[in-house]
Amino acid sequence: MKFEYKRPDDLKLEAYGKTYEIPPKTAYLIDEVNKITERISAAGSSASDQMMAVRDGIALFIGEEEAERIFPRDTLLTAANSDEMTAFWFCLNECSNRETEAVMAKYAPKRKEDIRVSSNPKK
């Protein structure tokens, strides 16, 4: 038996005049996304705190420099479109989730009904 793992190429997302490579989730990225989600929830009705958390979440995926280029901190609360920021945050998460699901689909155990044993190919 031989196991070979080949990580799929990162999904490429075109946005804001650039192409970003979105990786599958790592333990670090999952932990950080969870922290951002907790910050958003903890912000309650404070839209400014929610937007700061969303912006930090975007930076997790595309880097601080790019997040600053698109959503500068100094104008975040006065000029940024909260719907646009939230949509981009969801899009980045969805892209990363798709990458992770592709890896899982390739390597995860199959349902018992889907397993074919060579000595009995009908089962």
PLM features: residue spans?
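Short, isolated positions in well-ordered beta-strands
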Residues: 20-22
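Short acidic, Pro/Gly- and aromatic-enriched capping/linker segments at domain boundaries
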Residues: 1-11
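Short, surface-exposed, charged amphipathic helix/loop patches that serve as local interaction elements
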Residues: 27-123
